[in-house]
UniProtKB/Swiss-Prot annotation:
Primary localization: membrane
One Pfam family from the record: IspA
Phylogenetic placement of the source organism: Bacteria, Pseudomonadati, Pseudomonadota, Alphaproteobacteria, Hyphomicrobiales
Protein name: Inner membrane-spanning protein YciB
Encoding gene, per UniProt annotation: yciB
Cited function: Plays a role in cell envelope biogenesis, maintenance of cell envelope integrity and membrane homeostasis.
Amino acid sequence: MPPLLKLALELGPLLVFFFANARGEMLIERFPILGSIGAPIFLATALFMAATVIALAISWSMTRTLAIMPLVSGIVVLVFGALTLWLHNDTFIKMKPTIVNTLFGGILLGGLFFGKSLLGYVFDSAFRLDAEGWRKLTLRWGLFFIFLAIVNEIVWRNFSTDTWVSFKVWGIMPITIVFTLLQMPLIQKHSLTDEENTAS
């Protein structure tokens, strides 16, 4: 899959979520039937769920596979989005990033506790590292996911819904990109050469 299309499929649902929340009242004025869903955050949640399903469907149709992280995240979006709409309580969709990041962080750190560097199983086809490299990278990503979960809790519990939505779309992605780039020295240091990879 082309990198730009992959990025669009990852960012698309988030942009739909941001736009629907920011322009929800305008959309409801233009399409009154949408008002039955509720306030802009609930309309945004419904469209976020739809966009997530569409993005996963496009990804599946092109690659005949779904990466584990987008799949898990998509399932949580649908579950917590449905709870948000059913109970008419936006707390559930706000907690979704906390649940997903805690889940990923817990799995990675739990794997290390049992001596397994689980990132190696996920990204081994993308790049090869020695055992120490996978251990360090797994530890860093595990702690980073926990950090994101804590930050999400702080933001949604202490700021307005609009601020939380903006942070979710325009804050988390740049932070994640910067963190990813900061891992490049570690990846380069522990990368295996073709000879080492063949020998291992």
